[in-house]
Amino acid sequence: MKCCRIMFVLLGLWFVFGLSVPGGRTEAASLRANDAPIVLLHGFTGWGREEMFGFKYWGGVRGDIEQWLNDNGYRTYTLAVGPLSSNWDRACEAYAQLVGGTVDYGAAHAAKHGHARFGRTYPGLLPELKRGGRIHIIAHSQGGQTARMLVSLLENGSQEEREYAKAHNVSLSPLFEGGHHFVLSVTTIATPHDGTTLVNMVDFTDRFFDLQKAVLEAAAVASNVPYTSQVYDFKLDQWGLRRQPGESFDHYFERLKRSPVWTSTDTARYDLSVSGAEKLNQWVQASPNTYYLSFSTERTYRGALTGNHYPELGMNAFSAVVCAPFLGSYRNPTLGIDDRWLENDGIVNTVSMNGPKRGSSDRIVPYDGTLKKGVWNDMGTYNVDHLEIIGVDPNPSFDIRAFYLRLAEQLASLRP
């Protein structure tokens, strides 16, 4: 019964945050400008291919996007990083999953935030990246923030980690050394580059009910229930949210309540807030070596009398009833949240999607038929909600298969 309640809370939160082309090859591989593999990177509360009873985050009720792309000659892989974790932690996990090895969150970072330095060990989806090669990252929602941070760490490393390693005579992950240029392109889909005001709704809810703590406690309990991780893996090992061998439940729960995670800014919730996103934007900048593409989504209309935005018919029910009305009416002059922030896709404000602006010096340019490096190529806005763009929520008028195959074809045409 407890497992059922946990999964109900989880699925509800996933809806809050985010949450035809015939078969055969779309073009001859010999005509492509690059053969870099595609890597799919999920958003907040996302999951891997082996979780959720095989229900795919990338494809959902519409099918399997990874399989579609592979069947059409585009080598594609799916990452599975922490669904509730910060972008820093997720970027470190993505790196280890790509090249292989043990996740290293950084000695300085771990000491600062009070969690373990090392995480799980992975064989590596593309270990050859250590010797060269490039990849394309297609990221949904928070995954776009994570991808941007990964590129920044790969190329620039972390000065703080380098100085800490030298001062304390500890090892340094290659990720923090910098000088790695293996991401050819980053495509963000419905990403809250400037945050989402939905976090403000959660903050308001916390006045009456500590939602974040409830979720993390549920995650901790679920992580200790047999077989639960096979259905949904919270991947919060770095926070010690796993019961130790021989540890009584009472002792475990007391230790859980004392965890620094409850007040930490090293979480997805902070990174997805407007202030958290702005802080990230101040140091994570577009690389001149990488192409950046941004796709925006919206599923609301503007009310003539109020000026607020309301959900269109067809938006998934949870977002339409719970989230979109708040997003479509929330204004906060102190934060600079005005009428431009009201249009949304049920989870994220559309104005936040075409690239980082608050605290950022990145340039955003409309796509004119030629993709450019080092700037954000704004690919336009699609009339789909946050879940329809990845197939989790069906939309018969949106050809999701054609969308991703066309995108893969564009990425294959990029000159390294």
From Swiss-Prot:
Keywords: Calcium, Hydrolase, Lipid degradation, Lipid metabolism, Metal-binding, Secreted, Signal
GO biological process, one term: lipid catabolic process
Active-site residues annotated for this sequence: S141 (nucleophile), D345 (charge relay system), H386 (charge relay system)
GO MF annotation list: metal ion binding; triacylglycerol lipase activity
Region forming the signal peptide: 1-28
Temperature dependence: Optimum temperature is 70 degrees Celsius. Highly thermostable with a half-life of 315 minutes at 60 degrees Celsius, 125 minutes at 65 degrees Celsius and 45 minutes at 70 degrees Celsius.
InterPro entries, A to Z: AB_hydrolase_fold, Lip-like_C
E.C. code: 3.1.1.3
Main location: secreted
Catalytic reaction annotation: a triacylglycerol + H2O = a diacylglycerol + a fatty acid + H(+)
Enzyme class: hydrolase
pH dependence: Optimum pH is 8.0. Is stable in a broad pH range of 7-10.
Presence of the UniProt keyword Calcium in the record: yes
Protein purpose: Triacylglycerol hydrolase that shows hydrolysis preference towards some of the natural oils such as olive, sunflower and corn oils.
Family: Belongs to the AB hydrolase superfamily.
Further comment: Is stable in polar organic solvents such as DMSO, DMF, acetone, methanol, ethanol, heptanol and octanol, which could make it as a potential biocatalyst for the use in industrial biodiesel production.
Protein name per its UniProtKB record: Lipase
